[in-house]
């Protein structure tokens, strides 16, 4: 393909399709807050009024926002500005999930801010549900297929390796990886 055609193709890809505009209108009419310049492809949202997306966010297709509680005033899922969410991510929200500005969430990541209890004397489907918010600071990068569990807070500038399971909070400026995730080293700066 010629260089000219490649440039034209790249510019066309930046245009918002009529279907994407209709999707945004539908979500807004149902209570979602969507910042200017945010791209919304094919996503599934159970309670749109629980979603607040900042400016210039990019969401890839097949993202699932599941607010698993009775109807409550929102929002419970708050994205900052310039957040990128990769294909196939899942947000299971019962309390609150907050992503700071400039976060990069690679494809296939899962966020779960609740958990069933573990009382051996009660059936699993009758257990008390424990919840705690998930909060990511600014400029956080999660590699592909990470799982972030209830109560986890990730500090500004932290990096989490692909396939990690986060069961505890990550301090700012650190790199973590593994199952369960543990500290690898500080994030370095390059001049």
Protein language model regions, located:
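Terminal amphipathic alpha-helical/low-complexity segments used for targeting or macromolecular assembly
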Residues: 1-37, 56, 102, 108-109, ...
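Flexible, glycine/small-residue-enriched loop-and-beta-strand segment within the central core
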Residues: 44-152, 179, 187-188
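Short hydrophobic beta-strand segments in globular cytosolic domains
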Residues: 143, 149, 161, 166-167
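Short arginine-rich
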Residues: 168-173
